[in-house]
């Protein structure tokens, strides 16, 4: 399949260092957005014996042998596999999390030097090729970097890794090059669909890159900055974009997320918003979910606004959007037994009317309502139930938003209650994996019941406010 015809994602990422989070955990989170509104997703666990030993891509002619002894890992693949697996994200049995990918931008100068590789790797492949084989976030960067050097890529992507201690962000550069940054423990990132890494230090252990990246920049006069030309390297300036599209599609998302998380600024179109922000308060899972569901609330750019103009409502691309296929918040907790550390908070469908569920990842199966989505509509599956709720909610947001808010408060409280109880009684369980698998069943049951109840209440409320009505009756 030609590069220009391949499917492209369109996501938003949030990264949180362990000292920036409320409980000392690391978090990497992303909306898995697509190019069309519906694309059913599944939540599964891959056992070592199920991992292929020889991999063949669907969208390219890439083939390679994979190492022996893979780790168990979770993933959220497409239900319809005609364009590949697209695992999106997961946590492995070493409690290493990976999210892949955030589509980013590039420029013709680097592509003229290091063109894309027609039969290289892409988003459909990366989790399968990396996550089962790494035991730290840094190892994830190293393995992916080596794969990029060997096989190349046909698209620009950002990839996140986390373990108990570290959060890393890697961005591909051209066909074979890459750069990665360790996010400081006290900081966070809100990353849209552009090249995000700004200041880069080649002589620092918290930065990693292709071995010849600095030489590539210097020898080919790629650095556009005057100030500190020989020592200052802003990779967004060198390899990325600063376009009109960025000013309406990308930068406003970063601006809104940073404002909400405590780093306010005035200009939503600013091309120089920082990549990394020091946290001004401790960040919760609920904070991350709000950012990834947001649509410029309390600003004149809200598509659901009632006091702004039609032009203002359509000016910027919101983070929460109809093309949200799923959202994951991969949390690696400290100060708990290893089996409890990896938590994959997960929701399907447009984020305005869904809820994230804290699924444990040291498991041997996933709940059927999250595992068994098909391409055909089926409201007994959480993907389709969430999609139904989102469509109805979008029809009259102001009418339904209070129901949504109450629903989210109550469901998140219930999930925390189940999680606290599961954590508390974990040591008494004889079969730890079976115990956590059953806890996930309890979480899924509560989630499905709550989502069904929300939809029912929305139908009842909406039926009394339909346009097709007449106030006289018999």
From Swiss-Prot:
Q: Family membership, please give it.
A: Belongs to the peptidase C69 family.
UniProtKB keywords: Dipeptidase, Hydrolase, Protease
Gene Ontology molecular functions: cysteine-type exopeptidase activity; dipeptidase activity
Top EC class of this enzyme: hydrolase
One family from Pfam that matches here is Peptidase_C69
Which residues constitute the catalytic centre?
A: 11
GO biological process, alphabetically ordered: proteolysis
Please indicate which superkingdom the organism of origin belongs to.
Bacteria
Protein name, as recorded = Probable dipeptidase B
Tell me which EC number(s) this protein carries: 3.4.13.19
Which reaction is catalysed here?
A: an L-aminoacyl-L-amino acid + H2O = 2 an L-alpha-amino acid
């Amino acid at each position: 399949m030609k590069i220009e015809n391949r499917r492209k994602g369109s996501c938003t990422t949030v990264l949180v260092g362990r000292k920036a989070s409320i409980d000392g955990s690391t978090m990497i989170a992303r909306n898995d957005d697509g190019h069309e509104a519906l694309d059913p997703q599944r939540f599964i666990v891959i056992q070592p014996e199920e991992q292929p030993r020889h991999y063949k891509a669907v969208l390219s002619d890439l083939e390679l042998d994979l190492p022996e002894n893979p780790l168990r890992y979770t993933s959220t693949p497409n239900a319809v596999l005609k364009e590949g697996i697209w695992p999106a994200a997961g946590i492995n049995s070493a409690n290493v999390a990976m999210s892949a990918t955030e589509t980013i931008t590039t420029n013709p100068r680097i592509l003229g030097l290091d063109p894309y590789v027609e039969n290289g790797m892409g988003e459909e492949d990366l989790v399968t090729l990396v996550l089962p084989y790494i035991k730290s976030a840094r190892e994830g960067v190293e393995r992916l970097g080596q794969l990029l050097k060997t096989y190349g890529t046909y698209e620009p992507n950002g990839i996140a890794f986390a373990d108990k201690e570290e959060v890393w962000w890697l961005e591909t550069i051209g066909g074979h090059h890459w750069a990665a940054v360790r996010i400081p423990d006290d900081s966070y990132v809100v990353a849209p669909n552009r090249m995000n890494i700004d200041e880069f230090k080649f002589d620092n252990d918290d930065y990693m890159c292709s071995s010849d990246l600095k030489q590539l920049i210097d020898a080919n006069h790629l650095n556009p900055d005057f100030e500190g030309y020989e020592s200052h390297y802003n990779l967004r300036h060198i390899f990325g974009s600063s376009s009109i599209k960025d000013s309406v599609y990308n930068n406003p998302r970063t601006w809104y997320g940073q404002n909400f998380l405590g780093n306010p600024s005035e200009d939503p179109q600013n091309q120089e918003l920082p990549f990394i922000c020091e946290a001004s308060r401790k960040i919760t899972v609920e904070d991350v979910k709000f950012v990834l569901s947001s649509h410029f609330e309390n600003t004149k750019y809200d598509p659901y606004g009632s006091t702004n103009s039609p032009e203002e409502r359509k000016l910027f691309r919101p983070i929460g959007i109809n093309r949200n296929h799923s959202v994951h918040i991969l949390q690696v907790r400290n100060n708990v037994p290893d089996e409890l550390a990896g938590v994959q908070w997960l929701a399907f469908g447009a984020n305005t009317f869904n809820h994230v569920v804290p699924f444990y990842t040291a498991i041997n199966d996933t709940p059927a309502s999250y595992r068994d989505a098909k391409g055909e509509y089926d409201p007994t599956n959480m993907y389709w139930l969430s999609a139904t709720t989102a469509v109805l909610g979008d029809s009259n947001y102001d009418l339904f938003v209070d129901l949504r808010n109450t629903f989210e408060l109550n469901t998140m409280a219930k999930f925390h209650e189940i999680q606290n109880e599961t954590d508390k009684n974990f040591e008494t369980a004889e079969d730890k994996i079976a115990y956590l698998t059953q806890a996930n069943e309890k979480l899924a049951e509560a989630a499905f019941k709550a989502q069904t109840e929300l939809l029912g209440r929305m139908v009842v409320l909406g039926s009394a406010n339909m346009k097709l009505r007449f106030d006289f009756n018999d």
